[in-house]
Amino acid sequence: MNRIIICGQDHSIDCPTITWKDPGGMNAYQYQKFNSRNLTLDQLKQQTSCFVLHHSVTYTAKTCYDVLVNRGLSCTFLIDDDNKDGYATLYQTLDVKEVAWSHGPLNSNGAGVEICYMPQAWENTNLYSEANRKKYNVPEHIIVNDTVQNRTLKVFAPTQAQINTVECLIQTVCLALDLPAAFPRDDQGNIIKSILQDPKSHKGLLGHFNINVQKNDPAGLDLDSIENNVKLKLANSTGAGQVLSEFSSTFNS
């Protein structure tokens, strides 16, 4: 059953998922690197203003998870670099109601996702060489130019399978939490890929670069396309985001 867990409830999602409750899952509860909240879904909706996208600078979700643990951090969702019928695997390490330690001053404003790939082609264009792809069991990534924090970078983009899962996740979270599927835009209508003067004032989707001037994630994504696709999915939504079941909060860890 493909689902994510929000306030103890299973919400259906159209991509392969592994939660901390499942065999092979990654359980951030055991490390206590987060703040726990006992919230109902309605209370969580009231307290949520954003959903934040990150890139991991790791080849796989497992490595990303290990790095977060070693650094005393956490992230609610991780997207692996695999392909299962056109979608990358989504890992959930905590209930969405918890405050993961992943985006500083906005940790309590919303959950986030680490898209697991190595973007830094500006440093090394051989990160996804044939040898490295074989070593880490990951697919090929294309190089694109992206302007982040007013600097144009040569970056490895995430795969289409990862993007497909990103869109599914955003759709499900926005539907469940009544969150606008919209990135911040300037007066000309362009998505802002730099720090915002007041990130907490934007209700909707954010990149880590909107929160911290030292961050350039998520780099290499076509955010206009992602936003448009998610809005189309939401307009035609039939099953994704549906509440499947409810658990007592005592089973969240």
Q: What does each of the following model-derived ranges do?
A:
Residues 1-109:
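N-terminal catalytic cores of peptidoglycan-degrading enzymes
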Residues 53, 111-113, 205-207:
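Hydrophobic faces of well-ordered beta-strands that scaffold small-molecule active sites
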Residues 1-24, 44, 119-253:
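Basic/polar, cationic surfaces and motifs that engage anionic cell-wall
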